[in-house]
Amino acid sequence: MVYKTKNPDQVSWTQKIPQPSLDFIHSFNLPKTAKIIDIGSGDNMLVDYLLEEGFENITVLDISIKALDKVKKRLGEKAQKVNWVVSDITEFQPDSTFDVWHDRATFHFLVTSEQISVYLDRASKYVSDYLIIGTFSEKGPERCSGLPIRKYDEDQMSLSFSDGFKKISCITLDHETPFKTKQNFIYCSFRRI
């Protein structure tokens, strides 16, 4: 719904350069053939940077076809190099696993124990190597785009993903929205065990 009526500079999660995500991905020293999925990508710029860096096996998932259409239009012919999936993450059942599962700002929209359980099950089944989760920290907002969210600290993140994953590192940082407000995020990376 949001992507039908708003441009990137009108939504709080817009991030021109997804630096924390790129830093985590670079730290894994991945081959360019690594299978990377961006969960709840919306119209963010991560796929642009991954393509520019030569990654060849990228999947972009979002519940909004409008958001994905905006990204496809922005990428032009490069969009043909990406696997596009329109799905709610709690209904997503891929055919194979991913070397990297990246999620910036989707996990915190899952507020019921059932939604969270399904998400954790999907991650457990379909992540072969690395997991990156960026979500609102305990200092983050109470709502986002009018929707309720769930906030996390490092211990809660580690516990949430403790079944099958070992935490590599976590960072907290302020994301500056297009309207110059600050939102505090926690990013954690995990390795499959």
Regions found by a protein language model. Give the residues of each.
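Class I (Rossmann-like) S-adenosyl-L-methionine-dependent methyltransferase catalytic domain
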Residues: 1-96, 110-193
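A conserved beta-strand element that flanks and buttresses the S-adenosyl-L-methionine
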Residues: 102
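Short catalytic micro-motifs in class I SAM-dependent methyltransferases
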Residues: 105-109
